[in-house]
Amino acid sequence: WGATVITNLMSAIPWIGQDIVEFIWGGFSVNNATLNRFFALHFLLPFVLAALVIMHLIAMHDTVGSGNPLGISGNYDRLPFAPYFVFKDLVTVFIFFIVLSVFVFFMPNALGDSENYVMANPMQTPPAIVPEWYLLPFYAILRSI
């Protein structure tokens, strides 16, 4: 139901909206494959956000810097984005990924939830994402679009 409401917003796009909805669903209806695709996209979203953060750091702190948006030459009044701090942060990130890799590759179920092994049911909203009663009018409005 939630996948239907969210993706039906795409159907408001003229001419190609319905095609986009069917592409996202993987067919003409929401079924187990669609829900598994949504779960996979929700897994990938943090990595996409991390990539955007890295792109921001590269774009804003490379040559011009966020303290000099006009690109005016005058490095004497601009603080550098200290390489020491970048290196320190990279060491921290690498240590985090090493620890995370140990869990992922050697103990995959240590931090898991037994709910992860339950097959998705397209006819039942999972209890963790059941909408609150005060949001139901807004969901009704979205469904009517």
From Swiss-Prot:
Other remarks on record? Heme 1 (or BL or b562) is low-potential and absorbs at about 562 nm, and heme 2 (or BH or b566) is high-potential and absorbs at about 566 nm.
Q: How does it assemble?
A: Fungal cytochrome b-c1 complex contains 10 subunits; 3 respiratory subunits, 2 core proteins and 5 low-molecular weight proteins. Cytochrome b-c1 complex is a homodimer.
Its organism's taxonomic lineage begins at:
Eukaryota, Fungi, Dikarya, Ascomycota, Pezizomycotina
* Necessary cofactors: heme b
GO CC, alphabetical: mitochondrial inner membrane
* Annotated positions binding a ubiquinone: H61
Q: Which UniProt keywords apply?
A: Electron transport, Heme, Iron, Membrane, Metal-binding, Mitochondrion, Mitochondrion inner membrane, Respiratory chain, Transmembrane, Transmembrane helix, Transport, Ubiquinone
Family statement drawn from the similarity comment of this UniProt entry: Belongs to the cytochrome b family.
Question: What's this protein's name?
Answer: Cytochrome b
How does this protein lie in the membrane? Answer: Multi-pass membrane protein
Annotated positions binding heme b b562: H42
What does the entry list as the binding residues for heme b b566? H56
Quick check: keyword Transmembrane helix in the entry? Answer: yes
* Keyword flag ATP-binding: no
Q: Where are the transmembrane segments?
A: 38-58, 85-105
Look up and give the organism this protein is from.
Answer: Aspergillus fumigatus (Neosartorya fumigata)
Tell where it localizes: Mitochondrion inner membrane
Give this protein's Gene Ontology molecular function annotations.
metal ion binding; ubiquinol-cytochrome-c reductase activity
Function of the molecule:
Component of the ubiquinol-cytochrome c reductase complex (complex III or cytochrome b-c1 complex) that is part of the mitochondrial respiratory chain. The b-c1 complex mediates electron transfer from ubiquinol to cytochrome c. Contributes to the generation of a proton gradient across the mitochondrial membrane that is then used for ATP synthesis.
Annotated Pfam families? Cytochrom_B_C, Cytochrome_B
Origin superkingdom: Eukaryota
Q: Which InterPro entries match?
A: Cyt_b/b6_C, Cyt_b/b6_C_sf, Cyt_b/b6_N, Cytb/b6-like_sf, Di-haem_cyt_TM
